[in-house]
Amino acid sequence: MNPEEQVVTWLISLGVLNSPKKIVDDPEEFLKTSLKDGTVLCKLIHRLLPGSAEKYCLEPKNEADCISNIQEFLRGCAVLKVELFEPHDLYSGEQFSKVLSTLTAVNKATEDQPSEGPCSHPSALSSAAGGAHTDSNSTASQSAKEMTENGSHQLVVKARFNFKQTNEDELSVNKGDIIYVTRVEEGGWWEGTLNGKTGWFPSNYVREIKSTDKPLSPKALKGLESTQLTKNYYPVVLQNILETERDYAKELQSLLGTYLRPLQSYDKLSAVDIASLLGNVEEISAFQQTLNQALEDVAKLPENQQRVGGCFMNLMAQFRSLYLTYCANHPSAVSVLTQHSDELEKFMESQGAANPGILILTTSLSKPFLRLDKYVTLLQELERHMEEAHADHEDVLKAITSFKSLVSQCQELRKRKQLELQILSESIQRWEGEDIKTMGNIIYMSQVMVQSGGSEEKEERYFLLFSNVLLMLSASPRMSGFIYQGRLPLTGMTLTKLEDAEGNEHMFEIAGNMMERITVSCSTSQDLHEWLEHLQRLTKGTCNTVSKTQSWSAHSTFGSTGQIRGPLEPPKILKPWSLSCLRPAPPLRPSAALSYKERMSYILKDSSKSPKTMKKFLPKRKTERKASDEEFVIRKSTAALEEDAQILKVIEAYCTGAGFQQALSSGSRKDSIPQVLLPEEEKIIIEETRSNGQTVTEEKSLVDTVYALKDEVKELKQENKRMKQCLEEELKSRKDLEKLVRRLLKQTDECSREETGRKSSLIA
């Protein structure tokens, strides 16, 4: 490997030179180009000797800037006592061999550095620095010696600036982080521990925390007795909580005083939009001032009487109320920021915000969420450095759990409110009736699983509760929108909470005179509680609790004494008990396996769904005998038609007579069972064309015919829906293709024009 390649490899390994994206054919030319402006050299000397090249131009624009950077590098190399080159030797590239010699000498002068810390504490470096650094080096050595002799005490520092690691053995720190220094060496690089990770960081990026007996974190001293360390480090963590709380309160005050309060008189936005941006920041700011003062008062007490966790728990109810309200409003504020970004950016910049001004407002409105997350981390750190016998230990654990729960609730609430806003602002497919915005505010919304009637199939639905109606939506197949699935009036609605035997389902049931029975499965117990609470309040009813098995049996058999019945349902007759009750019951007619209410709702109600569950309750019919050839004669004669008409008249008269008799008997004898038409037992003769083209006649029951027709209608609707969806997708694809073709044609036209222009210029 020649000297040029060695220097390139060295610079890349130190992280001061970016690795080339393709193979370099001429390393010397690559070095000349990379080092010409002096930026890489200044980074190099700052990497090797932190603080030696603090002022240099990152983006030199002229020769003077480049020469200045090179001179800054040469001044930093003076302490290494190596042969230097002239600045113009590098800038002009004429005497580049001298540049290589200097870089090689710098590499050799620093190659004795220990491998733990790159660019740090070389032994040769300390001797080369001369007498100017003798005092500082001896002080650092003395500090290192003291920490070695007394392992229970060490330097505790706080980061003044952000530092991002460039090598694996370095430590990334953020401003405000507390670092436990484990090793102090000459050269400006210290070793420390942060969040369980140990690495090197520049010493001029941190400041020492002024405190007596600064102990190591208990986790940094494995195998040592940590009780005393924990006790001594506790004040440092508490002080960090107070400082961050004080900073947060000041940020809220600044946000209100500088931007939000003046925004109230801004005439470019409506009062509703301004209210969405303000939210309850005023209340949160006042509350944080109260919390800050309470924590300050706690910190003044003796350590064994400090109840930081108790202070948080006393105010937890206010925390929950204020921050949940803020989270519920935040999606509306984001919507206003998006819709009026130009106006708000002008306003923010007029108030002194840096460009882009909208970014300041966006990040400021997100700080309450970040602060909630920070409380969990701060209290966990406090608990780690607190004795278990401390009077506040239990309250700190409770506060950690409470804040975790609050953070989770806030995240769920924000997602739900964002979804509500999306539903209200976008068009809903197959919507029926007046616009959704006229229904008022959404009281509650969540995603549930629904079972209709006695069906075993669960369907995913989005329930939206308004003041007088429960709206049902489903997600589109591509999750690009929502589809209208119906609405349930709250009038006459009854609720039943279902308790599953295994206890792993959160279910309730909705029923009523004007609706089909629906079983709803919630995702969590909290979601179930919210639905039952809101629905009971709006329906002004009560909620019964039954087991899941009892619920199904109650809907599939006749009711017991005192059971509420519908207006068309016959009363239940209680027979006195006798020995005859022990006899086997006679076989039920097929239709009697279903309750009266379900049979009538299936037959008489205009439903869009075929009651497949009824077929499950009915026993299979016996195999019908094969009809003779005489029965398959085509019936197209006038006599045959007249015969069919007579049969239909008989059925119609039977239905009318049964209904009339039921009306009379219900008026005179309320306890008697009215005559009920069982359409399943009534037969009709129909003509049907088989797949082979032959027309045959069959005898079918009325209920089977109705079901068959409903199934056919349902299939036709589904087919129509699929065709409509395919047509929409086809139209969308055609539009996308048209846009693509137009864009390609435009690009082709521009390329041809440029080519023509180049040819004409060459000819000229």
Curated annotation (Swiss-Prot):
* Chief location of this protein within or outside the cell: other
Q: Residue ranges of region Disordered?
A: 109-149
Ranges where the Calponin-homology (CH) domain occurs: 1-110
**Which UniProt keyword terms apply here?**
Cell projection, Guanine-nucleotide releasing factor, SH3 domain
- Comp. bias (Polar residues): 134-149
Q: Which residues form the SH3 domain?
A: 152-211
Q: What is this protein called?
A: Rho guanine nucleotide exchange factor 6
Per UniProt, what is the name of the gene that codes for the protein in this document?
ARHGEF6
